[in-house]
UniProtKB/Swiss-Prot annotation:
Span of the signal peptide: 1-27
Region (Disordered): 34-54
SUPFAM superfamilies: (Trans)glycosidases
Lipidation (S-diacylglycerol cysteine): C28
Name recorded for this polypeptide: Glycosyl hydrolase DigH
Lipidation (N-palmitoyl cysteine): C28
Entry EC no(s): 3.2.1.-
Membrane topology: Lipid-anchor
Pfam families per the UniProt record, alphabetical: GHL10
Organism per entry: Escherichia coli (strain K12)
Length: 439
């Protein structure tokens, strides 16, 4: 999920386990023993969680670059108590608004990069609350969100960006990351410099290093074991490259990829291994916690694969090396939430074509299907997608929600993203949502 800008382009309780986790989370080391997070070969995850009878009416709440929260101005408040109060009140106001709209689930970004929005023993504090990496904001944002959302009868899924370490590679960012060397815990950037690569003009972890997979899994385990989250979600950031900033993993491929026919197959196996490890780990700790992924809307185009959709878009399988269809078929996910960010009239990637394609994928499985829709496009002028401008985008939004309600395999909708509920150009659509979903 390209959360930094979200201008998506078409080229688009088992006691033994808990004891082990307690030892892991009390340790200062950032790399857990492999046995703690790696399932036995050939094992399958336990049965998925039971589906709620209530349809998903979700919202993504992004914290990266303070897109939705915390308020940008709050970071300039010098008094920590006053700053925390302002941030907490902003969260309360947002949740009150979401409750009025009928939103029942918040996908809260707790790991936007290589930092955390909870007091982690593995990651340093995020700079998003204070302006400085590693600085304690004086409260626990994840716990505060959980308390306030659950008080309102809303669920919270902890949203992780698994591989991203930073949102840019500027000298100032490097200085900030290096400054954590004297902290506990320090950034993975300084603890494991050999894991770090540059890709898409960001510092990222190399997905092909087995220790990286285990390290990411340990972070998820920390949250699931310590907090009453209702779910865990990974966004669509797997292998994320740009034409001018490709990920150089040639050495990693030479070391670990000998058994694969191609580098692309090896990369897809790496993301597959991470998803499998995280899925098994979550179910071993708390079987009731849901695990899902929100990938790009196109798995593969039919022109490249007869099993693909009748589309011409950037495919997760080929671009991000994420075989999301396979993850569904193997039962690794409780839900999948493809980002179908195009209108019915976009011939290269029609909303209805993709939604029905995904419905067919999940039909023989136990994986639930939620559709991520592009609320950020509502009311925005577009020559390519003019439907978002017609009558404030309400007719297009209504068609998408109607389809989601009509197809039995679709269990709900997630809107991208929260701050767009407050934009002047979306207010007709917000009023429509309240009349449709609100109490």
């Amino acid at each position: 999920m390209d959360i930094c800008s979200r201008n998506k382009k078409l080229t688009i309780r088992r006691p033994a386990i808990l004891v082990a986790l307690a030892l892991l989370l009390c340790s200062c080391k950032s790399t857990p023993p492999e046995s703690m997070v790696t399932p036995p070969a050939g094992s399958k995850p336990p049965a998925t969680t039971q589906q709620s009878s209530q349809p998903m009416r979700g919202i993504w709440l992004a914290t990266v670059s303070r897109l939705d929260w915390p308020p940008v101005s709050s970071v300039n408040i010098s008094n920590p108590t006053s700053r925390a109060r302002v941030q907490q009140q902003a969260m309360i106001d947002k949740l009150d608004h979401l409750q009025r709209l009928g939103i029942n689930t918040v996908f809260f970004q707790v790991k936007p990069d290589g930092t955390a929005l909870w007091p982690s023993k593995i990651l340093p504090w995020s700079d998003l609350m204070t302006g400085k990496i590693g600085e304690n904001p004086g409260y626990d944002p994840l716990q505060f969100m959980l308390d306030e959302a659950h008080k309102r009868g809303m669920k919270v899924h902890a949203w992780f960006n698994p591989y991203r370490v930073s949102v840019n590679t500027k000298p100032g960012t490097i200085r900030e990351l290096n400054s954590t060397l004297s902290q506990q815990p320090a950034s993975v950037y300084v603890q494991h410099r050999d894991w770090i690569r540059t890709s898409g003009d960001r510092f990222v972890l190399d997905p092909g290093i087995p220790e990286v997979q285990d390290w990411i899994t340990s972070i998820v385990a920390e949250v699931v074991s310590r907090y009453p989250v209702d779910g865990v979600q990974f966004d669509d950031y797997f292998y994320t490259e740009s034409p001018g900033s490709r990920l150089n993993d040639n050495e990693t491929y030479r070391k670990y990829g000998g058994a694969f026919a191609s580098k692309a197959d090896w990369r897809r196996n790496n993301t597959q291994q991470l998803i499998a490890k995280v899925s098994h780990t979550i179910k071993s700790i708390k079987p009731g916690v849901e695990f899902g992924v929100s990938p790009a809307g196109v798995w593969r185009n039919r022109s490249h694969d007869p099993l693909g959709s009748d589309t011409r878009g950037a495919a997760a399988y080929d671009e991000s090396y994420a075989d999301t269809r396979r993850w569904v078929e193997q039962g690794l996910l409780d839900y999948i939430a493809p980002q179908i960010y195009w209108p019915f009239s976009r011939s290269a990637a029609r909303y209805d074509v993709l939604a029905k394609w995904w419905a067919d994928v999940v039909k023989p499985t136990r994986t639930r299907l939620y559709i991520g829709i592009a609320f950020y496009k509502v009311g925005e002028p577009s020559k390519i997608e003019p439907d978002w401008m017609i009558n404030g985008g309400v007719p297009e939004l209504k068609k998408q929600l109607d389809l989601n309600d009509a197809v039995p395999e679709i269990s709900g909708t997630i809107l991208f993203r929260e701050d767009y509920l407050n934009k002047p150009q979306t207010q007709q659509a917000v009023s429509y949502l309240q009349s449709r979903w609100g109490s």
